[in-house]
Amino acid sequence: ALRDFRLHIDSIDNRILELLAERMEVARNIGDYKKLHSMAVVQRDRFNEMLTAAEARAESMGVSKRFIHRIFTAIHDESVRQQIDDTERK
């Protein structure tokens, strides 16, 4: 019973980690593209667009908009950090 729930949570957590790793790889590729095309790392309009869409989708799924705001802001901040670090190394 409880063990089964915990195993299910562990499985979900592993999928989340895999998706975050994949997202960071794509973010680094975006950083390379931006550097090649002399673009700013932070594209505030894109972030706001993505965040608004995520919050709306979260609400429709019964997930707290505030929670999603914090999670996606943290993911975005890490993506920016990785883009900067990765392009500085090249």
Predicted regions and their residues:
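Domain-level signature for soluble enzymes in the chorismate/prephenate branch of the shikimate pathway
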Residues: 1-90
